[in-house]
Swiss-Prot record:
Gene name of the record: amdA
Effect of residue 200 to C: Decrease in activity
Annotated protein name in UniProt: Urethanase
Uses in biotechnology: Urethanase is a promising biocatalyst for degrading ethyl carbamate in industry. However, since ethyl carbamate is not a natural substrate of AmdA, the enzyme shows a limited catalytic activity toward this substrate, hindering its industrial applications. Variants that improve urethanase activity could be good candidates for applications in the food industry.
Keyword annotations: Hydrolase
pH dependence, entry free text: Optimum pH is 7.5 with ethyl carbamate as substrate. Exhibits relatively high urethanase activity (greater than 70%) within the pH range of 6.5-8.5. Has excellent pH stability between pH 6 and pH 8.
GO molecular function, one term: hydrolase activity
Thermal properties: Optimum temperature is 55 degrees Celsius with ethyl carbamate as substrate. The urethanase activity remains above 75% between 45 and 65 degrees Celsius.
Assembly and oligomerization: Homooctamer.
Classification via SUPFAM superfamilies: Amidase signature (AS) enzymes
Activity regulation text: Exhibits poor salt tolerance but excellent tolerance to low concentrations of ethanol. EDTA has almost no impact on activity. Activity is increased in the presence of Ca(2+), Mg(2+) and Co(3+) and inhibited in the presence of Al(3+), Zn(2+) and Cu(2+).
EC number(s) given by UniProt: 3.5.1.75
InterPro entries, A to Z: Amidase, Amidase_dom, AS_sf
Annotated source species: Rhizobium radiobacter (Agrobacterium tumefaciens)
Effect of residue 94 to P: No change in activity
């Protein structure tokens, strides 16, 4: 057997042609096999070329699966102990990495049985940056299956419990990271965000989580959902932790097309000075459309306790010298519909049909994960949970019968939402609304039907998904307890003005214990 692809058989050519509705004579089949020989020669040559890999600079062992005693809320997927540089700004910090991020030699499953057994051979760009800064990586945090859930019960290693009430959803999909920070098991953590997955669990677990400006933090070496929505960012127990971690992981990366020339070598990534800025003179806009949702469209209804808590936080900002006024962005209410089309069809194309990497972008491709996932999808597709099956079925339905028309229209419309936010942010420094309209919801039984499961796990995104569309930096800040459960307020700023979010969060933290507000 030659190294590389084999020449196709007649049956394989006919099968491919049939998939596209192309009738072929025996002569045409023979012609296509002959034409394939040139491509086979190129592919075999490509097979011999050593593949460029992302670097692995620090020694480590594979680690271990945590015991039940070590992991009462299922916040961990895997434990390890990887020591970084001897000195650096993250020296002494213990960091958990969401299990969508590759760490060489450490098992990775992206919350899914389909990837169980996969071990990356590379470190994601942000992992190398953290280790170079002296961090100690102490494990992979649990996440939802393929990260496509906003609740907290689809992780294949078991549902992740809310630290304030284990019977309730912790928010998702970066729920493991939020839980580990909330319970003091780590100092800092990495989360991913395509529809709110950093900010949602931060809100319901009472921690800080920043979805950075799109492209600011390299996504290279992380599992993709949809290339135009993918974000990765810091989570912490304080704004200082956010600033410290963001300062290390942000910046130019030639392998990430999401940066699109907006971030160049030498881009300033020091966010620590923002901690001392305060909010005096800052103009803060309360987003009218972020409050008062009635839930009639199936999304989570607003809880008056949450709305009042966030509005009370605005009074704190006023007391600190900020100017606060209400604004209206009607496009905020349609953003969820735009996100739905991009999320459904984009994930189907990238995450499933594209084997987790997709095509048509210029950057570093994780070929080992793509091959592993493709084989798993073919041999055991039944391992997909109800949420992922639902996304796949719906996404493929719209692709197959409506020819990506609505995906394209949604991509065109997202720029109008971006412009609407930019208009307000040309007059204000920050836009504020509840991160999630309601308090943490009760978990449904893992054996619940598809409808109950999907609704329970995907109805929290109304306020968060919009900034994944626009790319604006957006941060969840804990602002109070109601009925013993955390409430998060979401702060949004201009593109690449992540520092202003950190400044506002630090000022609010200094104003008093959020648990008593």
């Amino acid at each position: 057997m030659s190294l590389g692809p084999e020449l196709a058989t007649k049956e394989q050519i006919r099968e491919i042609a049939a998939d596209y509705g192309l009738p072929m004579t025996d002569e045409e089949v023979a012609d296509h096999i002959e034409l394939l020989k040139g491509a086979i020669a190129s592919y075999r040559e490509l097979e011999h070329i050593p593949e460029r890999k992302l670097p692995v600079k620090y020694p480590r062992t594979p680690g271990w699966r945590p015991t039940t005693q070590e992991n009462p809320l299922n916040g961990w997927y895997w434990r390890c102990e990887i020591e970084g540089a001897k000195e650096g700004p993250l020296k002494g910090d213990r960091i958990a990495i969401k299990d969508v991020v590759c760490v060489a030699g450490v098992p990775m499953m992206n919350g899914s049985k389909l990837l169980e057994g996969y071990v990356p051979e590379i470190d994601a760009t942000i992992v190398t940056r953290m280790l170079d800064a002296g961090a100690t990586i102490v494990g992979k945090s649990a996440c939802e299956d393929f990260s496509f859930s906003a609740g907290g019960m689809t992780c294949s290693t078991g549902p992740v419990g809310n630290p304030y009430d284990p019977t309730r959803n912790p928010g998702a999909s970066s729920n493991g990271s939020a839980v580990l920070i909330s319970t003091g098991q780590v100092d800092l953590a990495i989360g991913g965000d395509q529809g709110g997955s950093i900010r949602l669990p931060s809100a319901w677990c009472g921690v800080y989580g920043l979805k950075p400006t799109y492209g600011l933090v390299p996504y290279t070496g992380c599992a993709m959902i949809e290339g135009t929505l993918d974000h990765v960012g810091p989570m912490a127990s304080s704004p200082k932790g956010i600033a410290k971690l963001l300062s290390v992981i942000a910046g130019y990366d030639a392998d990430d097309p999401r940066q699109q020339g907006r971030i160049v070598p030498g881009f300033d990534t020091n966010y620590l000075p923002a901690l001392e800025r305060g909010v005096k003179g800052m103009k803060i806009a309360i987003l009218k459309e972020g409050f008062g949702h009635d839930g009639s469209d199936g999304m989570l209804a607003s809880d008056p306790l949450v709305d009042d808590c966030v509005r009370s936080a605005m009074e704190t900002f006023r007391g600190l010298g900020a100017e606060v006024a209400e604004v209206s962005i009607p496009e905020h209410l349609t953003a969820w519909h735009i996100w739905t089309a991009i999320g459904l069809e984009g994930f189907t194309a990238f995450g499933v049909n594209g084997n987790g990497v997709g095509t048509n972008w210029n950057g570093w491709y994780n070929t080992s994960m793509a091959e592993y996932l493709a084989r798993a999808m073919k041999s055991r597709p039944y391992d997909m949970p109800a949420t992922v099956r639902s996304v796949l079925i719906r996404g493929e339905y719209f692709r197959r019968y409506y020819h990506n028309r609505y995906y394209g229209k949604a991509q065109n419309q997202r720029h109008l939402i971006n412009e609407a936010y930019d208009r307000v942010l040309s007059e204000y420094d920050i836009i504020v609304c509840p991160t999630i309209p309601g308090l943490p919801t009760k978990m449904v039984d893992r054996d619940a039907g598809t409808l109950d499961t999907v609704v329970n796990q995907l109805n929290q995104l109304r306020n968060t998904a919009v900034c994944d569309l626009t790319g604006h930096p957006s941060m969840s800040v804990p602002c109070g307890l109601r009925e013993g459960l955390p409430v998060g307020m979401m702060l949004t700023a201009k593109h690449f003005d992540d520092a202003t979010l950190i400044a506002a969060a630090a000022a609010f933290e200094a104003a008093g214990d959020w648990r008593k507000m």
